[in-house]
Amino acid sequence: VAGGGYIWHTTGSGKTLTSFKTAQLATKLDYIDKVLFVVDRKDLDYQTMKEYDRFEKGAANSNTSTAVLKRQLEDDNAKIIITTIQKLATFIKKNAGHSIFDKRVVIIFDECHRSQFGDMHQAITKYFKKYNLFGFTGTPIFAVNAGVSKNPTLRTTEQAFGDQLHTYTIVDAINDKNVLPFRVDYIKTMDAEPDIDDKE
């Protein structure tokens, strides 16, 4: 866990609560200066902040711009910061010599399977000197479903974050009655012409 890793928890199983507790516990470690919780969309930024506030009012800080993010990174009282991948990317690009890059930072990515993570991963490893990287996902990318990537060393979730630290799959959640079971029905809606090539 010292270097990081990823947590595979199915949708609806409480990933946000787990990530909040992870962020909260990290801030209690004397040697951790900041915890960044990174989401990939603005609506998730707002949603995560609302959830975190529900767990503990005022425990986390969100931001509306890169300038606000910069102020929060410089504020010793702002321990947990929720931001978007876009704001963090802009901050890194515009503040190459910033003091945060020399501090001990835990960076937690929500939905760490997203495609734009590759560029952010390179920026983090280039600028941050002392970081721990964790990812939460309901749909990890494995070698068998990785597809093509600009960076072949970051094709899978494991390549980007390290070891899988915990798993709670849809089967686990259904068995525990934490999510409802579902059934897939395939319905044939029309008969295909036998001599039509699907590739056409």
Question: Predicted regions span which residues?
Answer:
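Conserved RecA-like ASCE P-loop NTPase motor core of nucleic-acid helicases/translocases
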Residues: 8-9, 33-41
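Conserved helix-turn-beta segment of the N-terminal RecA-like "Helicase ATP-binding" lobe
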Residues: 27-28, 42-66
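Conserved motor-coupling elements within RecA-like helicase/translocase cores
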Residues: 54, 67-81, 98-99
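Conserved RecA-like ASCE ATPase "motif II neighborhood" in helicase/translocase motors
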Residues: 80-123
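Interdomain helical connector at the RecA1-RecA2 junction of SF1/SF2 helicase-like NTPases
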Residues: 146-200
